[in-house]
Amino acid sequence: MKGPFRRLALAVPFLLTLTLNVSAETVAETARAWGLIGPWSLDCSVAPDRGEGAVLAYQIASGDRVVHRRNFGATIDESEVIAAKVSGDGMLNLRVFFPKLKQTREYGFAMQPDGTMRALYNRNQKGEYTIRNGKFTANGNPTPSQHKCN
């Protein structure tokens, strides 16, 4: 082999190795690297409640699992993040099992330049969307930014 073909032959196995390593990351590693771990809210100064004060936290649990805790003030629930992958455009795609709802949902977050994140889609396993293209399907309003709380 000569010239560009030789370089290509050397580059392909290297690129395949990189691809395999990326896909071998755990849910916890992916969530941590993307910046998801921690509490998020529309307004971190408001106490948890059903309206503007819901706190959505993503935490690393035993066994290197990621749990999604929703604090609505009067009620708190916990669900397991069963898959996390980052798309080529930087979107974090999650699959979460909600035991109280008895359903698995898939949703995607985009990290904004100011460090907030927005939900770009949210759907059930039947492909029924509550959020599509960054807008609520019920009213067409854009999803709000969520702030990371300390």
Describe each PLM feature range.
Residues 25-39:
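N-terminal helix-cap/turn-to-beta initiation motif at the start of protein domains
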Residues 46-91, 142-143:
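N-terminal glycine/threonine-rich, aromatic-flanked beta-hairpin/loop signature
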Residues 26-30, 48, 91-150:
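Beta-sheet ligand-binding and adhesion/scaffold domains
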Residues 9-19:
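Bacterial N-terminal signal peptides
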